[in-house]
Amino acid sequence: MLKSNVSYSTDKDSFTAGKACAEKAVVDLIETKVAFVFSSVKYNQNKLLEGAKSVLGTAPIIGCTSSGAIIVPAGVVSSESGFAGMLAIGDDETAVGVAGSERGKNPRETGKKVAKEAMAKVGTDKAPAYVYMIASPGEEEEYVKGIEDVVGCVP
């Protein structure tokens, strides 16, 4: 059964915020397979990730920044000094393959490459049940077409 937790922090220190999010998000998870992090642009992102990794170890971290706020089960979280939120997923049954790439010259080919790499990390050629992608605006559709070339219709 899929297990997940959501956490957040408004600590002023980037490292402390990342660590606090991770500590709360991994509670009762058997093995953290992936963590999604969304944070304020006010944080030093490298320090935030260092804090999170100090708890998560080698679990992949995916995410991006927000200039305004994040939404968690408790409501909208925002702070002038910074904010971060994390969704951690981990259980015995879930397999997660994470891959990334620089933009490249051909977004569709980049999408294919990333899809193949993520599937290889899981050790399967079976299409995933879920695909999550973060890309700069403008070429997302071409990345998705490349992913679909490999996995079929993107779930």
Task: Please describe what each predicted stretch is.
Residues 1-155:
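Cofactor- and metal-binding active-site motifs of prokaryotic enzymes
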